[in-house]
Amino acid sequence: MVKKLAVKYKFDRFQVWWEDATSHNEWMDLEETKKSTPSICFTEGFLLIKNSKWHTFFMSITGDEIGDVVIIPTKNIKRIKKIDTLTLYKQDFEYDNH
């Protein structure tokens, strides 16, 4: 009989296109500056929090800690696409299993 592994975490992975401020620290021509627009950014990561005010994504995980965190205001998200779901088990984080 195969022993069923206990799921430690399950996270959905998303691709997100979002709007952010653009800034320039050099001198710019007045007319050229009028053509400037906000930036469209791209993030791919695992969704941790989603609410009406923001989405929190992370890109790395080890045990109970995450890294490479991006918090995007929900109102700035232009497009979001679910890629897949990642299921992690306790033994995925045990050194001797790799």
Residue map of PLM features:
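Conserved RNA-binding domains used in RNP assembly and mRNA/RNA metabolism
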Residues: 2-98
